[in-house]
Every structure is written in structure tokens, then in C-alpha cells.
């Protein structure tokens, strides 16, 4: 229902972004932390 009501209860503590789902907030937080959890299968890059 949040999609229809516009409610965004999850807020980023580093900027003004707000999110409907906590998973989207967690993904966004990587912008601020620099975390890159997925490695390339062919080389050492992330």
C-alpha cells in the first residue's frame, strides 16, 4: 500500500533520500560507505 499512499518510512542518515522498502535503503547506503560486495568472476575487480 505504501506505493499508492506515497509513504516512505525509511530515511538515509547521510542525505535527504527516503525509501519505501528497507532493502532499497540498504542498497543506497553503499553510495556513502563505498561498500562493493560483488566481485567479478573473471578478475579481481569489484
Swiss-Prot record:
Which PROSITE patterns is this protein grouped with?
ZINC_FINGER_C2H2_1, ZINC_FINGER_C2H2_2
Map the zinc fingers (C2H2-type) to residue ranges. 1-4, 10-32, 38-46
Source organism superkingdom: Eukaryota
Question: Is Metal-binding set as a keyword in this record?
Answer: yes
- Which residue positions does the secretion signal occupy? none
**Per its UniProt record, what InterPro entries does this chain match?**
Znf_C2H2_sf, Znf_C2H2_type
Which keywords has UniProt assigned to this entry?
Developmental protein, DNA-binding, Gap protein, Metal-binding, Nucleus, Repeat, Zinc, Zinc-finger
GO cellular component terms listed in the entry, alphabetical order:
nucleus
Please provide, alphabetically and separated by semicolons, the GO molecular function terms listed in this UniProt record: DNA binding; zinc ion binding
Q: What GO biological process, any one, is recorded here?
A: segmentation
Q: What is its main location?
A: nucleus
From the Swiss-Prot or TrEMBL record, state where the protein is found.
Nucleus
Q: Does the keyword Zinc-finger apply?
A: yes
The UniProt entry's sequence similarity note says:
Belongs to the krueppel C2H2-type zinc-finger protein family.
What function is annotated for this protein?
Krueppel is a gap class segmentation protein.
Instruction: Give the protein name, as stated in the record.
Output: Protein krueppel
Amino acid at each position: 500500500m505504501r506505493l499508492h499512499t506515497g509513504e516512505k518510512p525509511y530515511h538515509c542518515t547521510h542525505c535527504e533520500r527516503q525509501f519505501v522498502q528497507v532493502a532499497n535503503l540498504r542498497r543506497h547506503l553503499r553510495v556513502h560507505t563505498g561498500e562493493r560486495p560483488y566481485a567479478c568472476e573473471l578478475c579481481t575487480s569489484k
